[in-house]
Amino acid sequence: MEQTLSIIKPDSVGKAHIGEIIAIFEKSGLRIAAMKMVHLSVKEAEGFYVVHKERPFFQELVDFMISGPVVVMVLQGENAVARNRELMGATNPKEAAEGSIRALFGESIGVNAVHGSDSLENAAIEVSYFFAKTEIVNSVA
């Protein structure tokens, strides 16, 4: 059973879309194995997005991710990484499939509602960034 990391970003938390987004995951068969709400520090956001450190949007991304609380989740299920990516939709909400999370709740390529791991390898790294193994409950689906 695969696991992937999902983050409901500050824009969606601030607009009270948490429940709607979680419902989309659960209706698709993904289960929540761990979840917490946190307000990331600059250090935490920079550490999480370190792979983008040399990209021109890095500081804007960090500033956005520390602008308010986020909900961090471990989603679990068959093909969890790919299913989460499909449910999220394209990074740019204008290009995201109708009914996808980003099409429904995203505003722009930078303010796009959610983050999701892009591979199994990155999912393992990202999950361990936010959660200890003892915090993850292997749900039975």
UniProtKB/Swiss-Prot annotation:
Q: Which reaction does it catalyse?
A: a 2'-deoxyribonucleoside 5'-diphosphate + ATP = a 2'-deoxyribonucleoside 5'-triphosphate + ADP; a ribonucleoside 5'-diphosphate + ATP = a ribonucleoside 5'-triphosphate + ADP
UniProt-listed Enzyme Commission number(s): 2.7.4.6
Q: What InterPro entries has UniProt attached to this entry?
A: NDK-like_dom, NDK-like_dom_sf, Nucleoside_diP_kinase, Nucleoside_diP_kinase_AS
**Active-site annotation:** 115 (pros-phosphohistidine intermediate)
Localization recorded for this chain is: Cytoplasm
Q: Its quaternary structure?
A: Homotetramer.
Q: What protein name applies here?
A: Nucleoside diphosphate kinase
| UniProt source species | Chlamydia trachomatis serovar A (strain ATCC VR-571B / DSM 19440 / HAR-13)
Protein's gene: ndk
